[in-house]
From Swiss-Prot:
Organism: Tolumonas auensis (strain DSM 9187 / NBRC 110442 / TA 4)
GO CC, one annotated term: cytoplasm
Domain of life: Bacteria
Subunit structure: Monomer.
EC assignment: 3.1.1.85
Name recorded for this polypeptide: Pimeloyl-[acyl-carrier protein] methyl ester esterase
Job of this protein: The physiological role of BioH is to remove the methyl group introduced by BioC when the pimeloyl moiety is complete. It allows to synthesize pimeloyl-ACP via the fatty acid synthetic pathway through the hydrolysis of the ester bonds of pimeloyl-ACP esters.
GO molecular function: pimelyl-[acyl-carrier protein] methyl ester esterase activity
Domain AB hydrolase-1, first and last residues per copy: 14-242
Amino acid sequence: MNMYIERIGQGPDLVLLHGWGLNGAVWQEIVPLLQPYYRLHLVDLPGFGYSRDVIMPDSRLATWSETVLAELPARFDLLGWSMGGLIALRMALDHPSRINRLILTGSSPCFLRQDNWPGIHPDVLSGFNCALQQNPRKTIERFLAIQSMGSESVKEDVKRLKSWLQQRPDAAPAALSAGLALLSSVDLRTELSQLRCPVLGIYGRQDSLVPAAAVDPIEKLITGSRSVVFAQAAHAPFISHPQQFSEALRQFLEQNEIQRD
């Protein structure tokens, strides 16, 4: 079974990868702002949304990357949010000739808190994993609330996230567990110096999952990258601040023009 990918708009190809527990509907706030300029590929990752029944042979990050990449254009720009950012990084590292430019939002090469590395406390992730086995939907809704905390439009953000979640089939339990395992175990920090494409990070200063304290360390690990931090945004700045987010993305792509065949 093929993944579900919604394709909208005209122009250079821009692929969007959503985060844990959600689906491609999460981009609805920025789609109208971007579709006049780009051919958008809104992916439902394997096991999520309309791709619920897409089964991968294993749950390694490279397998997520290869499974998604197999259904994408020959060359494209790539936007990854949260867990989708990990998959996007793996793609860009393994297939530099396919990725023109990379935008990461609310994402980190290592989500787990480490010595001298800001991130999510291990107890939080293990707690989510335990709760997931008992009540998946309630666990996802709790996750949505946590990632919206601190946003100046927190109630509206959570309401919209829940609405988009309900528009498509529930995620497969195996995909939810595999996604949490990625967030708990993947650490790409030592590989970031190998990235060859221009990279932009867009963050929210109120993000409790990718703390603002991680922004500078991430930027230092990616040669030539730049970051934008929205003071009143949390984990999903493209939802709380769609206009500013779209402007930052478009400016980055325009300033880093790629020679096309």
